[in-house]
Amino acid sequence: MSNVDRYDVHRDGIEKDRKRSRSRKPHQNGQSQSTMDNRPPWNNDTYIEGYDDVDEHGKFRKRGGGMPKTIDRQQEELTKNWTESLREQHHQPQKQ
């Protein structure tokens, strides 16, 4: 079995099988690592766009979500008002 390790029990000198954890995630000590910790010292002052969005395994970190920002809401409101004003001008009879 590939997921079983053998180990010796010191009491009685018996050899037993113990299942290995299938988890591939490294054990964390309750602290998350920053990508700044993994950068070489000569690269600490360099900013690379998108570098901090990817973890050590190449997966994108979850960012954002939740409620839209106030800027987005303001922009949506401005766009809505602008489209309504265009509709009003379009539906008015034109003078000849």
Swiss-Prot record:
Comp. bias intervals (Polar residues): 28-46
Annotated spans, Disordered: 1-96
Domain of life (superkingdom): Eukaryota
Biased composition (Basic and acidic residues): 1-18, 70-96
Name used for this protein in its record: Uncharacterized protein C41G7.7
